[in-house]
Every structure is written in C-alpha cells, then in structure tokens.
Amino acid sequence: MEQINLQRVVIEIFGGCNYTCKMCPQTTPGREKQFLRSMPLDQFENILDQITPKYGTPLINLEGSGEPTMNKNLPQYIEACTRRGLRSYIYSNGSNFTGNLMRDSIDAGLSLFRFSVIGYNRELYHKWMNVDNWDMIYQYACDTRDYIKQTNSKCKLDSYHLILDPSCVEYEVDQYQQNFIFPIGTEAYIWKMHNWSGNYKPDYERLGQRRSCGRPAADELT
C-alpha cells in the first residue's frame, strides 16, 4: 500500500460558532445539535497519538466549521500538540481571542492564529459578519501582535478576507491593506467570494472557462 504523505489534519475541537456570518453554512442551513459541542481532550489526544507513529508530524488545524476559541480549554489542546512536536494552527473570527485565552494559547506553543475579517471597514464587517465588532477585532489583533513580540513567540499572525464586489477587486484589496493588513502587520490571504456554503443561487449560466476563487497556490491549502 502506498504511504500517504499526510501534511495537514483538521480536527474540530468545537462545533458551534458565536457568529452568524452571511456567507457561512454555520448560519444557513446550520448544523445538527450533536455537532455543536467540544471534543473531549482525551479523545483529541488519542487522535494525536494515532497520527504521530504512522504519519509523523503533520500540521494540526484546530477547527473545522466551528469556532475553536469557544472551547474554554483551548490552551490545553494547543499544549497537547506542542508536546508531541506538532504545529497547531487556528482560523477564527477572533472575538474571544483576548486576555488570558490569547496569552495562554500563545504560551502553550500556538504556531499560527488567523483572524477572519470579511468587510474592509466597520459598516461592511457588520453587514457580512452580522455583528458590529470591527473595532474590537482590530484591537484584539493588535494585542495579539504585541504579545507575540513581547514574548518572542514564534507564533505567526495571519488574516483572511473576501472580495465582496468582483468588479472592484483592486479597490477592495487596497482597502483591506490600508484598514487592517498593513497597520497590524498580518500576513494576509484575500480570496474572491466562492459560495462554498451554497447559500447563493446564481441567476446566470456559467459560460466559458471556470476561474479560480483566488486560493494561494501553496503546498498547504486551506
């Protein structure tokens, strides 16, 4: 049997979410109740212990469709990865990533934290993420950046954004850069809207060659 070169494992440690983003399947159609809870820590560690002997040290993403920072014991999951020589990544709306949770997660050896920020100003953020948290998230991202520097942590700080109007790509990229990416200093990914939830029904027939949503052509894709 061919040996699988496993580079990334996505383990959902919390299935629910505290946001109701316009473009996300967590909002519409939603998830079954049995998925809206935490994965027990011992089950998580058991999974890690099955991975490492067979596949070495792939990257561990601590989320799937859920919001990982809603798991109150998040630093323990990160530490479990660190103890086994595994990198841990978190993709999050960032609304809980502050105070002790932020500091303890970074201290536990978190490899990367990515803020999802859809909308390049307060008004558009509110529209697409359905909550008026632009200023708060901006501050949390700054606090995270500062704590990483203060502690000489190797944790990377990223951000993720979507183009909202395909006819204004250059303008929106510039706005994301000026309003969030450059002031905070994140490594950013800006994608075209890709309707991955299937929430939107196009009223046209797609003609010609299909185009990419803009995912980075890297070895590790999200």
Where are these regions (language model features)?
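Conserved alpha-helical substructure of the radical SAM core
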Residues: 1-112, 123, 127-135, 139
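Radical SAM enzyme [4Fe-4S]-AdoMet core and its adjacent flexible, acidic
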Residues: 12, 30-35, 39-42, 84-87, ...
